[in-house]
Amino acid sequence: MFSSLRLAISFLTIFPFYNKMADNKELAQSVSYYPLVGFLLGSIAAGVCYAMHSIGLNLAADVLGLVTIITLTGGLHQDGLMDTADGIFSGRELHRKLEIMKDSRVGAMGVIALATVLLLKIAFLFELDLAQKLTAFIMAPMAGRWAMVLAITRYPYARATGGLGACLKQAGKTQLALATLILVAGCLWLFGLPGLALLGIVFFITWLTVEFIVKRLGGMTGDTYGALGEMIETWVIFLILLGQQIRML
């Protein structure tokens, strides 16, 4: 377990906790712990946000919390979001979309997608009470990384030749089940039983989002895993805000 967790942390963050070359089987087993990595990242971000709030900062605290996660992950998922947007919204045929996504240059749609996601996250976080804000910082990365596990284990890989994401395709139902258990436990700890309603909506939105991507690309890639995570994080923060406004969470 701890070996797989260290590998998951090393794979998804800038922390080199796994000091040897992992094979595909080890990478696949580590997928189970992606939501736990999200919990750790979110806890650090929540701590930064709380510290900034304690000295009187509000909007800056929200932004610094988000910047903390981006920094700790090396901007990996934001890069995937931009590449995915450039490819999907290019209006080209399938093979050209995949080529565009591999291009290191960023297009207009990628910039627009990243700006939109960041602005939405900041706006939603700013409207939250401090307690809900801190739970959102923890819950959103957990759910985003669970969504990646769902896509990895249940949907085909889009490219004919393997990329970084293809190394994870040995992951299956066992990894998804454990990742789901971690997510459910975390949600119940943060929200109690009302959190189950939140999870149900998150599961449905995740399914819709993955289906949207697969329909346009023929499968998933490493970039789309990151894009999916970013989109689900944004949805989770919004849903927590909605739950606050209707006094459900």
Curated annotation (Swiss-Prot):
UniProt record, GO biological process: cobalamin biosynthetic process
InterPro entries found in the cross-reference section: CobS
Catalytic activity: alpha-ribazole + adenosylcob(III)inamide-GDP = adenosylcob(III)alamin + GMP + H(+); alpha-ribazole 5'-phosphate + adenosylcob(III)inamide-GDP = adenosylcob(III)alamin 5'-phosphate + GMP + H(+)
Membrane topology per record: Multi-pass membrane protein
Record's subcellular location: Cell membrane
Keywords from the UniProt entry: Cell membrane, Cobalamin biosynthesis, Magnesium, Membrane, Transferase, Transmembrane, Transmembrane helix
The enzyme's E.C. designation: 2.7.8.26
MF GO annotations: adenosylcobinamide-GDP ribazoletransferase activity; cobalamin 5'-phosphate synthase activity
Cofactor(s) in the UniProt record: Mg(2+)
UniProt keyword annotation of Transmembrane present: yes
Main location group: membrane
Pathway as given in its UniProt record: Cofactor biosynthesis; adenosylcobalamin biosynthesis; adenosylcobalamin from cob(II)yrinate a,c-diamide: step 7/7
Signal peptide: none
Keyword field contains Transmembrane: yes
Bilayer-crossing regions: 36-56, 57-77, 106-126, 133-153, 188-208, 226-246
Cellular component GO terms, alphabetical: plasma membrane
UniProt xrefs under Pfam families: CobS
Top-level enzyme category: transferase
HAMAP family in the record: CobS
Assigned protein family: Belongs to the CobS family.
Function comment: Joins adenosylcobinamide-GDP and alpha-ribazole to generate adenosylcobalamin (Ado-cobalamin). Also synthesizes adenosylcobalamin 5'-phosphate from adenosylcobinamide-GDP and alpha-ribazole 5'-phosphate.
Name this polypeptide is given: Adenosylcobinamide-GDP ribazoletransferase
Native species: Desulforamulus reducens (strain ATCC BAA-1160 / DSM 100696 / MI-1) (Desulfotomaculum reducens)
